[in-house]
Amino acid sequence: MQMADIAKQREQPPRAMSTTSGSDVLKSTTTGTTTGTTKSSVHTSDTNYGVGSLRSDCSEEGFGSNLTPEEANWLNMARVFTKAEKPFKEQKTFRVARKLRTWRPRRSVTWSFLRRLYNGREDMKEDLIRDLADLEIEDKPV
């Protein structure tokens, strides 16, 4: 009989949406002359953080059937803000015109390419020798 009274008087832990912290390490219940503290822990090495609220939320009586005022307000505001939103983005209607690849002579053909093509590669040696001569540093007398 005493265990049933203790279970009835046990206070509900705070829910996830409330503003209070969810750490319920020790819960003390007072029935007449006996005071009992029940640890909400699974193992001795457990940190006792949130185990009691996890057990009570998964039980039959508090399975989310009753909402706290904060949760009800949050749901109401979510409905208000998401009422005007469209569920999917409208598809843009555009046509893709496929371009034919045309050969542009001005892009790929240079004068040096044409000279190599018609005169052979021997003609380019003179330009190379001239460029190398321009790059050489001449010693100036001091």
Swiss-Prot record:
S-S bridge residues: none
Compositionally biased, Low complexity: which spans?
29-38
Keyword RNA-binding found: no
Keywords, alphabetical: Developmental protein, Differentiation, Spermatogenesis
Name one process (GO BP) from the record: spermatid development
Which stretches does UniProt call biased (Polar residues)?
17-28, 39-50
Stretches for region Disordered: 1-66
Protein name, entry field: Spermatogenesis-defective protein spe-17
Gene coding for it: spe-17
